[in-house]
Amino acid sequence: MGLTPLEGVVMGTRSGNIDPAIMEFIAKKENLDIEGVMNVLNKKSGLLGLSGGLSSDFRDLNEAAEGGNEDAANAIDVLCYSIAKFVGGYVAAMNGVDAIVFTAGIGENAIPVREKVVSYLGYLGVTLDKDANGHRGEEIVISTPDSKVKVA
């Protein structure tokens, strides 16, 4: 997060990083004042908005995506891309990393998110051990022994 909770990756109801001009676009398109736009960006965007209002809870979206809901699947894809983009930015800023650690509810429990995020990071020489990645809520290394970057 930056100055406000909107900065960063896509979240449950928050947009994450956006083009600043989107605020004017939303205001005009939806006939909203600045408070209305901020309400949309803070409470009706993110996974909730991307999923067409289905849910802000990853567990619900994952279940829906597994059942064929394209909006839920797209919301998860945007989340993973958003995370990978931030990881890539920090890797560049730090001139490389030794490890990437997934934390919190989604990071510790969302097997498909870890898999998809790591798939974007293949250029770093990161490889995922699919069996190890199948564990939830455990503090373990989920990268392969030959991975150039450890993932936990």
Predicted regions and their residues:
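Glycine-rich phosphate-binding loop of actin/hexokinase-like ATP-binding domains
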Residues: M1-A27
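Hydrophobic alpha-helical scaffolding
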Residues: V9-G16, S51, A73-I76, G107
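A mobile "lid/hinge" subdomain adjacent to the ATP/sugar-phosphate binding pocket shared
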Residues: K29-A75
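Active-site proximal loops enriched in glycine and acidic residues that flank catalytic Cys/His/Asp
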Residues: A65, V101-I106
